[in-house]
Amino acid sequence: MGLGWFGAPEHKRWLAYETHALLHYARAAQVPTGFGWIGQNGEVDPSHPVELWITGRMTFAFSLGALMGIPGCRRYADHGVRALNGPLRDPANGGWYSAIGPEPDAEGRGVPIDPEARKECYQHAFVLLAAATATAADRPGAHELLRDAMAVQDRYWWDEDQQMPVESYAADFTDPEDYRGINAAMHTVEAYLATADVNGEVRWLERALKITDFAVKVPAREPGWSRPENSSA
């Protein structure tokens, strides 16, 4: 039995409906410093902070909506870009905070939940993904965000010797973790591909290929092509 229904008009209409519904629902996640968790009641759950990865993902999704021409998405994409350019930034150490409060301080800066929290590759990958997609949508401030996100990737996250991203650092980008996880690497591949699509720089494609090559070669050495989630540098 074939899968010809993938291209059927009714299926495409269903996909479009679900896309619009999800983006409309996601609007409720907006808070002053980014995007929060949405609870089962459709409202922001105040028990959760504003997390970097959620704000990055939301900015990515609304930027896609803007590229698709879905009404209302541009303002939410712009809000995400402003949050990533502003309160979620770590002005002292560089990079971005993992989690902040929903309200800025008196000077408009983000208030980190834990100033000593480690910086994670997983979370920073979504900054790059959001920046690249918002740049493709030509959102205000996105080009500058992409420039800075690429610089942070070059300086800290890409390990040229290992040909893999570093998993995490201390808050001040010291103490790199001797661990390589496929989850963070997977999302880094996604972000690198999006970046290459936007700026045409081959090095991002080459890095993505190195990561996927690592992910494939390890299970090739294991019985049954078993892919372990964790490994060391």
Describe each region flagged by the PLM.
Residues 1-233:
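Glycan-recognition and catalytic cores of secretory/periplasmic carbohydrate-active enzymes
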